[in-house]
Amino acid sequence: DHKKIYGLINQQNYKQLALDLADASLIADESIVDTIINGLYMNGTPVADLFDFVVDIAGNIVEDKLKNNKIAHTDAYLSRKIITRSVDGLNRDKPNGNFNGKNALCINFEDNLPDIGVVMSEVLMRHNGYNVFNSGSHAELGELSSIIVKRKINIVLFYLCNLQCCNAVVEDNVSKTVNQIYDSIKVANKLKIDILFGGEGLFLLDDIKGKIDNTFLTYNDLKKLI
């Protein structure tokens, strides 16, 4: 299996690797998951391409299986957790300290998820010279101001996915999420720092469209914004 994976990596066959990554994650084969992600990385695949063409596609494959009732919610959750762990490992190659003098804070809107989108954002920003703090699920807004000042943050990145398990875009929570986004923008404007919003979840929030300047769907988009 590993030999086949290395062959696909050398051919840059992203489509098949995404399928294999989805399958391996669903049977909890961490060895194959790590081989695909680390193998592509070591082979010189740009981080943004690795995320856009392999990791995100694998996530979509798993999500489609969930929508079609081929797998359970728990399967999808475990799949994403395994992939997230492997992706997070890429942060070790760019520890904080190798930076361009700028500090970034990454936040997501979920309390209970291993949010792969925010982890991929952190990896990409570190590989582009940022010193990154990942606070995971949304910090209290009062806290947000003090963290920004204390850590000398230049840019804040919020990530909101639209996966079935994402509670932040469930109807009951939408107004809360929208309020959090508006409040975050106010904090950023007051402190004169850049704010980025990523993920397809934003497109489910009608009130927000057109009111946020810097949004990204792909990691190649994010790369251009930073």
Q: Which positions does each model-derived feature cover?
A:
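Cofactor-cradling patches in redox/metallo enzymes
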Residues: 144-208
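Short acidic-hydrophobic, aromatic-tinged amphipathic segments that line or gate anion-handling sites
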Residues: 213-222
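Conserved hydrophobic helix-helix packing surfaces used for dimerization/oligomerization
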Residues: 102-105, 156
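Long amphipathic alpha-helical segments
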Residues: 1-95
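Short acidic loop-to-helix transition motifs that present clustered carboxylates
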Residues: 137-143
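A structural preference for short, hydrophobic beta-strand core positions in alpha/beta folds
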Residues: 134-135, 197
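Short helix-loop-beta junction
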Residues: 119-133
